[in-house]
Each structure stands twice: as structure tokens, then as C-alpha cells.
């Protein structure tokens, strides 16, 4: 089993001088803000891969989850995808989706998403002929109600 000191730093590289180091905006912030390295224009209903020009080495016990920033979500901007595997070493890109009605401009240095480190578990998978039954069964997609 891999043992890692919880205080071990996560190494990252600025691939260009346009890259900005990930930052936490408060001591209690769950995520590190990621910054756009370039200018982009995203029309309504479209999506764009935003480059950060940052690459990093994830701890073996974690993966990186790219999550939306609440201020951008309020403007109709969402995240597509959002998993950085622990063995990925390339430029971290963020897929922004413009669900709003207006064109959205991303400027160099804008905070575009947050990176949250989450522990990961790699279970052994076992194929079986059937699963144990539960009261819920195969009912999903809102079947438990709103309240």
C-alpha cells in the first residue's frame, strides 16, 4: 500500500510564462482556483477547452476534480468533464460550457474553475450473474421524490 504524508507538497509546472499558480482564496476553501492562460470567447450554447498551461503530479491516493466556481455558475457557465487522473502529466485544460444567453469572454488570468483533490479507491471488480435486491431496486432519476 502506498503511504503518503498528508503534508507532502503537490508538484506542478508552469508550462509557459502565461500560466498562473493555482491558489486558495481562503484558509477554508476546498479547492485551488485555476486560471486561464489565454483569452477566449464562448458563444451561447457552445463549449471551449480553456488551457491553464499548468501540469502537475497528483498524489497516488488522489485524483483531481475540476469543479465549477459558484460565481461563474450564476452566469450560466458550467464545467464539462473534470477528472484529472493521478498518472496524467499534461497541460490541465478546463471545458467551459456557456449555458447562458450572452457571449462569455474569458480573459488571460481569469479564475475559471477550482481543483479539488479527492481520495480515490481502486476496488477489484467482480462480474456476477445478479445483484442483491433492495427496496429501491432499479428506480432512479428522481424516484425518491423532492422532499
From Swiss-Prot:
InterPro entries in the cross-refs: dUTPase, dUTPase-like, dUTPase-like_sf, dUTPase_trimeric
UniProt catalytic activity: dUTP + H2O = dUMP + diphosphate + H(+)
Source organism superkingdom: Viruses
Record's keyword terms, sorted: Early protein, Hydrolase, Magnesium, Metal-binding, Nucleotide metabolism
Binding site residues for dUTP: 68-70, 82-85, 88, 93, 95, 111
Entry binding sites for Mg(2+): 24
CDD domains, per the entry: trimeric_dUTPase (cd07557)
Function recorded in the entry: This enzyme is involved in nucleotide metabolism: it produces dUMP, the immediate precursor of thymidine nucleotides and it decreases the intracellular concentration of dUTP so that uracil cannot be incorporated into DNA.
Similarity-based family: Belongs to the dUTPase family.
Name listed for the protein in its UniProt record: Deoxyuridine 5'-triphosphate nucleotidohydrolase
Amino acid at each position: 500500500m502506498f503511504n503518503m504524508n498528508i503534508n507532502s507538497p503537490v508538484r506542478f509546472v508552469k508550462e509557459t510564462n502565461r500560466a498562473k499558480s493555482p491558489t486558495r482564496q481562503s484558509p477554508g476553501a476546498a479547492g485551488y482556483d485555476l486560471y486561464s492562460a489565454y483569452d477566449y470567447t464562448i458563444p451561447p450554447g457552445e463549449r471551449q477547452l480553456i488551457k491553464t498551461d499548468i501540469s502537475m503530479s497528483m498524489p497516488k491516493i488522489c485524483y483531481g476534480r475540476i469543479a465549477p466556481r459558484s460565481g461563474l455558475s450564476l452566469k450560466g457557465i458550467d464545467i464539462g468533464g473534470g477528472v484529472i487522473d493521478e498518472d496524467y502529466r499534461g497541460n490541465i485544460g478546463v471545458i467551459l460550457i456557456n449555458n447562458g444567453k450572452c457571449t462569455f469572454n474569458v480573459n488571460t488570468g481569469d479564475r475559471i474553475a477550482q481543483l479539488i483533490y479527492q481520495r480515490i479507491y481502486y476496488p477489484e471488480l467482480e462480474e456476477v450473474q445478479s445483484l442483491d435486491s433492495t427496496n429501491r431496486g432499479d428506480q432512479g432519476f428522481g424516484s425518491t421524490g423532492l422532499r
